[in-house]
Amino acid sequence: MINRERLTHLKQLEAESIHILREVVAEFANPVMMYSVGKDSSVMLHLAMKAFAPSKLPFPLLHVDTKWKFKEMIEFRDQRAKDLGFDLVVYSNPEGEKMNISPFEHGSKVHTDVMKTQGLKQALNAGGYDAVIGGARRDEEKSRAKERIFSFRDKHHRWDPKNQRPELWNIYNTAIQKGESVRVFPISNWTELDVWQYIYLEGIPIPSLYFAKEREVVEYEGTKIMVDDDRMPETLRSTAQKEMVRFRTLGCYPLTGAINSSATTLPEIIKEMLLSTSSEREGRLIDKDQEGAMELKKIEGYF
C-alpha cells in the first residue's frame, strides 16, 4: 500500500492518474485513448506506458486528423507510434474531406464542428468505444473546470453539464447503458505547471513547436499564425514576417496562435509560464468563435 503522504506533489498526481487509467481498463470493455500529439497527450501516453508496463498498452490511441494540423505534429505522431509500437488509429471525417472544409474559407466554428466534433463522434461510433480517455485539465478552461473525471455521455456523445454524477474521493461511477459512453480525464487535477515539470523530470519527448524559434508568422484574427503550408491564402502569406515565437498549445495551425518568446529549453519555458498572466488557451481561436464556445462544443460531443 502506497503512503500518499510520503509522495511528492508530482508523484501523488502520477499515482492518481495511473489509478484512474487502471480503473478504466478494469471497468470498461472497449476503451480508447485520444492522442492529439500535444504536451498533455504526451504526458498521458507516458503515464499509460507506466501504468501497464511491461505489457503493451491495452487500448489503441485515436487521433482525429482534421488535415490542418501542423506538419511537425503528424511527423511526431508517426515517429512515436513507430518507436513505442502502440496501436494508432487515425480518422478523418470523409464528408468534410469531400467538402474541402477549410478554417480560412469556412471559419473556425464550421471547421471545428465538421472536422473535429463530427469526426470524433464518427470515429467513436466506428470503434464502438465505451470509454474515451483524454488529457483535458480543469485549469485549462472554465467549462472543463466543472467537469467530472469520469464524465458521462449519452448515446449521441452529448454532455449535460447540469446532470453530472457525484465523485467522492477516488470512487468513480462507471455504470453505463448500451450505446452510452464515458469520457475519462486522468490528469484533470494537474495544472499547466505540473505538466511542464513532469515533462522535464521524466524526460518526455514533445514536439519542438513548444520551443521558441524564428518562424514565419502572420497576423490573423487578432493573433500570430505560423505559415505551415501553401494552403494559407496568398494575401495572408504575403504579409509573413520572421519572429521568435513558440506555442503554448497545439491544434490546427490556422487556429492556433503563437506567442513571442525566447524560451528554448524546458527550464526557460517553466520560468516563462510562472510569469505569465494569460491562459495557455488564449491563442486557440476555437474558444472565441461564440459566447461560451467551449461548453457549447462539449455539449455537442467535442472533447
From Swiss-Prot:
This is Sulfate adenylyltransferase subunit 2. SUPFAM superfamilies: Adenine nucleotide alpha hydrolases-like. With CysN forms the ATP sulfurylase (ATPS) that catalyzes the adenylation of sulfate producing adenosine 5'-phosphosulfate (APS) and diphosphate, the first enzymatic step in sulfur assimilation pathway. APS synthesis involves the formation of a high-energy phosphoric-sulfuric acid anhydride bond driven by GTP hydrolysis by CysN coupled to ATP hydrolysis by CysD. Transmembrane segments: none annotated. It comes from the Bacteria. Belongs to the PAPS reductase family. CysD subfamily. It catalyses: sulfate + ATP + H(+) = adenosine 5'-phosphosulfate + diphosphate. Its EC number is 2.7.7.4. Pathway: Sulfur metabolism; hydrogen sulfide biosynthesis; sulfite from sulfate: step 1/3. GO terms for biological process: hydrogen sulfide biosynthetic process; sulfate assimilation. PANTHER family: SULFATE ADENYLYLTRANSFERASE SUBUNIT 2. The gene is cysD. Keywords: ATP-binding, Nucleotide-binding, Nucleotidyltransferase, Transferase. One of its GO terms (molecular function) is ATP binding. Heterodimer composed of CysD, the smaller subunit, and CysN.
